[in-house]
Structure formats: C-alpha cells, structure tokens
Amino acid sequence: FMVIADSGEAEIVFCTSCDYAANVEKAELFPLEAQEEAMLTKEEVVTPDCKTIADVCAYLKLPVDHSVKAVAYNSEKGLILCFVRGDHEVNEIKVINTCGVIDLEMATEEQLAAAGTVGGYMGPVGIDNKKVIVVVDATVMKMHNVCCGANKEGYHFINVNPGRDFTPTYVADIRLIQEGDPCPHCGGEVSKARGIEVGQVFKLFTKYSSCLLYTSPSPRDMRRS
C-alpha cells in the first residue's frame, strides 16, 4: 500500500484513466505490437567501436526501437542473457521471477566469452539455450527485421526476426514500465510518481502461529494451527 509523496523512496506508476497503480518493479505490461513487415534476409554488418544502442543505431541510421538491447547476468543457475527492445530497460525482479533464481549479479567478460559472446555485441542469434538461459521480452518477439549484436567484436546483425533466427529459453514480460506505457488494465497511459510504503501483505502461512503455539477451532470443532 503506497501513498504518493515527493520524498518517497519507491517509484510507482498509476493510470490516468482508471484506478490501476503499482510499484514499478511489479507493474505488468502487455507486449507492444509492431507494424507488420516482410521478413528480410539476415545480414552481418561491421559496427566498429559501437558498444551501445545509441552508437549502433546512429552508425547504421536505424531507429532505436528497431534494435534489441542485451543485458547479461550470472545466477546460481548459470548465465542469463536478457533481451529487450532498444529503448526499454530490463526489470531484474521480473527476470528473477521468470528464471526462478534467488539473485542476480552482472556477468563477467570471462563468463560471456565461455558462452560464445562478448560485451557490447551480445545477441540472441547462435546462442545455445541449452547451456545459457536466454530470456526475451514478449515485445521483442513481435518485432521484425531488428538489429542486434552478432556475438563478436565489431559486428551486429540486421534484419533479424524472432522465431526464424533464434529461439529463447523463456518469453516473458521482463521490461521496466515507462511513463506513457499503456495501462495493463484499461489501455490508458500510465504516469510515474514517488511513493512511501505504508503497508504490505505477506503470505506467512503458519510461520508465527506455529512459533506462538496458537490454535483455533475448525468448522468441525477440531483443533489445528
């Protein structure tokens, strides 16, 4: 339960058209539809010194929302490669929940090299999803003819099509909600604000009642915790 306040430590989103509100880490999103395009032939292109989405798109003269951004994490289950649209950000809480891991830390260059990729040029094409967990945001799976890393220094692919050119381990909503995104309840636009947490609900089951030896009668007058 949140109260909007400029001094709040948490960031929340709320819909301007309905009563939907959520912490940004928990806010759900539906995949954004992309304009239909005929699939083009995948090409590998040289992209020297282009390790960021902004640099790659400027060099290739492509809109950022036609690119795919990669973020790599290490976990107790091994390497996790996450892919979202170029103008989106990865929501780590959603990745943890999707993959069923306890925690994430940024992957090292050594771990990336062992998986057959390199920082700044990571992409889903050619990655063995039996050795590496590949998580692709649902919006990416609806895109066509996108640009992504070619998993080697100084190269990217263009005209990559999800499903045809790569198969992920998981397809899920893993992106961080942004101001102006469509509300998951009514389709209206969401806005952002700071908030203070004034209450929270936990599923504690019998954790405390068992410790306190508390019992209550059942409908049949049986004693149970």
Q: What residues fall within each predicted segment?
A:
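Extended, low-hydrophobicity, polar/charged segments
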Residues: 2-216, 220
